[in-house]
Structure formats: structure tokens, C-alpha cells
């Protein structure tokens, strides 16, 4: 998937260490677990986390993608986005998928997160037939809360249990 400034592609083996070093692997106990999950996610689900690459430089600048909702530790809240399906569009997932992203620190505050997340949501809607999304955001992360609101997400009163 391409945007004006970004290439959003599958994560390659050469990307694992850079992703791990930038603390994306927080949901995984080891680098090997991150590698195993990433290698199987596309084949098993048809979606997952993708590498976000700056087109001009070719640099890996973060990750963004869709996952099945999961239990998160810590203090946080679920945010939800429901898009209307286009007329006659088939719905593949009745349950929401979770939107996640992480832009590496040197590339923040340049609009890359919004550009990447909008592309991921577009892919989900038009390629996967997904019209309901959620995001889990830590309560103290007011920047991500405002960002989610910019994307159209609204805080849920009760947490979704996922699948």
C-alpha cells in the first residue's frame, strides 16, 4: 500500500532487529516470539502489522496494522470507530479489529502516524471488508487519545472482549 510519502509493506526478516530495538516488541517476551508471530500473521489472518517505510529515504520509520483484539495490561481504555459499509459491500468481520501503530521517535510529529493509520483503515475497509475498529490507549497517553479522536475514534464506556 502506498501513500503520498509512505510505503506500507509486509515486515521482512531484515526489519526485526530495528523494530525490536525501537521497543515495538513490548507485547512479546523475546525477539524470536516477535519473528514467529510476524512470519505467520499474514498467512493465517491475511492482515497484521506492516512496516511503515518513508518512500523518499527508504528508511523503516515504524509499524502500523490490524490485529485481533487482545487483553492489555495496565490502566487504559478502548476507543471505537464504526464506518458505514458501502452499499452492497460484504462484511467479512462482524467483530472489530484492533488498530495499532508505532512511529519511531526521530520520525514523530511529521504526520506519518496519521498517514499510515488512514491507509491501514482504508485497506481494512476496502480489502478486508472491516468496518468496525478499536484501539486500546493507556489513560495517561493523552497524545494518543487526541490522535484517536482525529481519526474518528470515540472512547467506549465498557471494554470490548474481542473474539
Labelled PLM ranges:
Residues 27-49, 54-55:
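Active-site rim helix/loop that mediates acceptor-substrate recognition in acyltransferases
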Residues 1-28, 53-163:
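Acyl-donor (CoA/ACP) binding surface of acyl/acetyltransferases
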Amino acid at each position: 500500500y502506498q501513500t503520498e510519502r509512505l510505503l506500507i509493506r509486509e515486515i521482512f526478516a531484515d526489519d526485526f532487529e530495528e523494530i525490536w530495538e525501537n521497543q515495538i516488541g513490548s507485547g512479546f517476551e523475546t525477539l524470536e516470539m516477535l519473528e514467529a508471530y510476524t512470519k505467520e500473521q499474514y498467512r493465517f489472518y491475511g492482515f497484521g502489522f506492516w512496516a511503515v517505510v518513508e518512500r523518499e529515504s527508504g528508511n523503516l520509520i515504524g509499524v502500523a496494522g490490524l490485529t485481533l483484539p487482545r487483553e492489555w495490561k495496565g490502566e487504559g481504555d478502548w476507543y471505537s470507530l464504526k464506518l458505514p459499509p458501502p452499499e452492497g459491500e460484504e462484511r467479512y468481520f462482524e467483530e472489530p479489529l484492533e488498530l495499532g501503530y508505532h512511529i519511531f521517535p526521530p520520525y514523530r510529529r511529521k504526520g506519518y502516524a496519521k498517514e499510515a493509520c488512514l491507509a491501514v483503515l482504508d485497506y481494512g475497509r476496502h480489502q478486508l471488508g472491516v468496518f468496525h475498529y478499536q484501539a486500546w490507549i493507556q489513560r495517561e497517553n493523552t497524545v494518543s487519545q487526541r490522535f484517536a479522536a482525529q481519526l474518528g475514534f470515540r472512547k467506549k464506556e465498557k471494554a470490548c472482549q474481542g473474539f
